[in-house]
Amino acid sequence: MSLLSLDLSTKSSGWAVFDGNKLNDYGCITSSSTDLIKRIHIMTDGIKEILNKHNIEKIVVEEVRPDLGGSNLQTHRALMWLQASIAFLIHDEFNKVQIEYIYPSSWRAACGIKNGRGIRRESLKQYDVTFVKETFGIQVNDDIADAIGIGYSQINQVSNEINWE
């Protein structure tokens, strides 16, 4: 199965393509525009290019969740709009591709990265970069590291099925 994993942002979105258990390609789509809608178009167009280049069967996206207490509503809204833009792209042009969403705590746990109360976001980003360097032998920025971690969590899922044979 060919999998595209995404760590979405309207300024710098990390992505990774896995074919089976192999990391096949990765990168980052960036935009410095001050216009939010233009940034969303740039991100969506970049993802469309990746989908046209690779035969993707499934996309896994880091779920958007407002920070409890100190949430930045404007940022949350922008990320939700970006997710919607990608959902429309998939629906309209790549309708055989599945989209799934995963919470950061879930994919990090699957990668063996300790997270939860008391661990700062900045520390987690560095742990993600270190995980990718140790697991794949590559040095990447935190956006790409997150995308690779998201994909890794999917390709290394343990089956809970019981084999009765």
What name fits each language-model region?
Residues 1-165:
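Phosphate- and other anionic-substrate recognition elements at nucleic-acid/protein interfaces
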